[in-house]
Each structure stands twice: as C-alpha cells, then as structure tokens.
Amino acid sequence: MRSRLALQLLLAGVLLPGFAMQVCAQAPETPVDVPTPASDWPKPVKDNRVFTFVTFDQFEGRTNGPTTSFRWDGQGWIGTDFNKLWIKSEGTVTNGVTSDGDHEILYDRPIPHMRYFDWQAGARVDLDSGPTRAWLALGVQGLARYFFNFEPTFYVRDGGRVAGRLQGYYDLYLTQRLILQPQVEMNFYSQADRARGIGTGLSDIDGGLRLGYQFSRKFAPYVGYVYSGTFGQTATFSRQSGQPTGLNQFVFGIWLWH
C-alpha cells in the first residue's frame, strides 16, 4: 500500500510540472494597452481657473438737509486662487465737485501661514477735482479674528511723502438677511499737501453704521448714519476754505456683489 502511494506521488511530481508548462504555453497572451503620456493626463483638481469678483461696499447718497452728496467705494479682482489683479476706487461728489478720488491697481497674493490674509502691492492715483497725485502702495487685506474685514495700506510718493490708511467693517447678521454693518476709515499723512487740503498726522475719519436687507446674495439696499470729519492741520485747511470740519449725515444706498 505504501509503495503504491509513493509511486503515485513520484509520477505526479514528474508529470504535473510538464503539463502546467504546456497549458501556459498554449494560453493566449493578454494584450497590454500603451500607457497614456503624462502630458495628456487631465488635472486632478481644477485649482487654477480664472475667476472674477466685483463688490460695492458703499454706493450711496448722503444728506443732512443743507448738504447732499453721493459716495462710492468699490473694488473687484480677476485671477486665480493664488494670483489676482485688484482694482479699487472710491470718491465723493458734492455739488458737482469730486473729492477723495482714490483709485488703485494692485497685485494680490496669499500670505504664507496666514489663512485669511493676502498682501497687495501696486499703485494709487488721487484723481478728482483737485491736483492729481500718484503713490506706490503696499498693504494687506483679509479677515481678522471673528471675521472682521481689515485693510491697512501704506503709501509712498516722491519727496519722501508717506501716507497710511486703515479701514475695516464687520457684517453682523441679525437674521439670515438683515445685516448691521459698522464701518470706519482713517487716513494719515507724513507731510502736508495744501493744494489738496491735506495736513500732517491724522487727516480724516469716515465712520458709520448701516442696516441692510439682503434680498438676494448679490443685492442689498440699506439705510444708516455716518460721521465724516477732518482733524488737525487738515481741519484748519477746511475752515480756511469755508468747508465744514465735520458732518453727520443719513445715508441710503445699496450693497452690490457679483
């Protein structure tokens, strides 16, 4: 019995490998597709698309009875997530005279390790009814703690003149559509520019409180109250030219996003 089992195992060891090789030799080869060149691969994520954005934070009429004016403050950009071209513009029109005309074109890029802030660099031109001035600009823009919109900017021009602007606002959602927005803007100058009515130090403040209703995600009318005033040497220039040094005004306008 044992010799018979040993003979069967011996025959299996001799014959089975040859049989397996014969079966493999007769099996047809599986065709292999030629790999797609890496240059033809699609991008795994569409993370380099060009987008556009435009917003008007102020597009409003201002009045206190004797004095009525129109003010705009808007900005927009075009670019990718990492590289953008910003355009900003603001100004005030009173009795057909434009003042505070400030227009900027800036290159924008995220600040490493600062999730909600970008640095911006470019040029600013003061273009209104007064003398034209040109500046180089450098600043940051983004969301500070508790999502407070914060935008400090530093300017320099010929003659070593330096200026700074600090502005910000906060959107407090009372409901899903009702928004209360406090806002402030301050301007500083290192040297006086009498032709433009600007003195040294703190030049002016514009601040207000607006209440808007967001009918859609692109449109929200609002009403509010603002104070705009000049200080120090700028206030002296205002008095000498017969202009008020401070105004309290009611406002009505629209916020726009696109």
Locate each region found by the language model:
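Residue-level signature of outer-membrane beta-barrel architecture
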Residues: 78-80, 109-111, 142, 154-156, ...
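Repeated loop/turn-to-beta-strand initiation elements of outer-membrane beta-barrel proteins
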Residues: 81-87, 113-119, 146-152, 175-180, ...
